[in-house]
């Protein structure tokens, strides 16, 4: 399928490519692939400065109110330049989950912070090789999370995570502040992805969605 970009979208692609070519280099990025636990902070600072972290978030929460096409154009250029940072997991995955399923209080707490790039979001859905498990490894009971979410991209850098958990008789999509959560670095082929195991020990969490809605929400975000 051919996608025809309008003039504004073409300008986003051209300008983001120009900026990234000027501010990134292979020499600067290669060490990040081998160093566990660090993402490309110059790229993240650039994303904040250029408003890319706010691109697809609603204007009511300090976003730019654009869509997935524009976000995809930036992500394409970031990938082209090998910029390593949790760009899509934060600016789309976590942010979109809160925008679509969060309460007014949850939106007020997190969306502006994600739009500014001052907070980073992570997505914790997988269990082993299963990207969207029927029985997640993490359990949700009485607004508490227990268990370990493994291989979470952006987990080392994140301030907030959206977790697919096993609730009482049904799946739960939960929001958790990662302050105080144990994080174990996981070496990967690209260590700038800041992959970590997140261990929850009765961590306070908030509900975003339950039952089939939780499953459908997770599928939509993926």
Set out the residue ranges of the language-model regions.
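N-terminal glycine-rich flavin-associated loop
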Residues: 85-104
């Amino acid at each position: 399928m051919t996608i025809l970009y309008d003039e504004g979208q073409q300008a986003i692609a051209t300008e983001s490519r120009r900026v990234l070519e000027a501010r990134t280099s292979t020499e600067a990025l290669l060490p990040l692939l081998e160093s566990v636990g660090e993402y490309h902070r110059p790229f993240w600072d650039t994303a904040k400065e250029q408003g890319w972290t706010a691109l697809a978030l609603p204007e009511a929460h300090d976003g730019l109110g654009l869509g997935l096409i524009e976000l995809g154009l930036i992500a394409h250029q970031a990938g082209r330049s090998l910029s390593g940072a949790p760009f899509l997991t934060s600016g789309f995955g976590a942010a979109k989950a809160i925008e679509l399923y969060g309460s007014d209080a949850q939106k007020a707490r997190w969306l502006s912070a994600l739009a500014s790039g001052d907070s980073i979001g992570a997505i914790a859905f997988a269990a082993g090789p299963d990207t969207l498990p029927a029985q997640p490894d993490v359990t949700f009971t009485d607004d508490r999370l227990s268990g370990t979410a493994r291989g979470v991209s952006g987990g080392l850098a994140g301030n907030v995570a959206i977790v697919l958990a096993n609730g009482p008789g049904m799946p739960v999509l939960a929001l958790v502040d990662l302050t105080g959560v144990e994080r174990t670095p996981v070496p990967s082929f690209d260590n700038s992805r800041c992959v970590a195991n997140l261990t929850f020990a009765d961590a306070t969490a908030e509900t975003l969605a339950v039952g089939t809605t939780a499953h459908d929400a997770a599928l939509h975000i993926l």
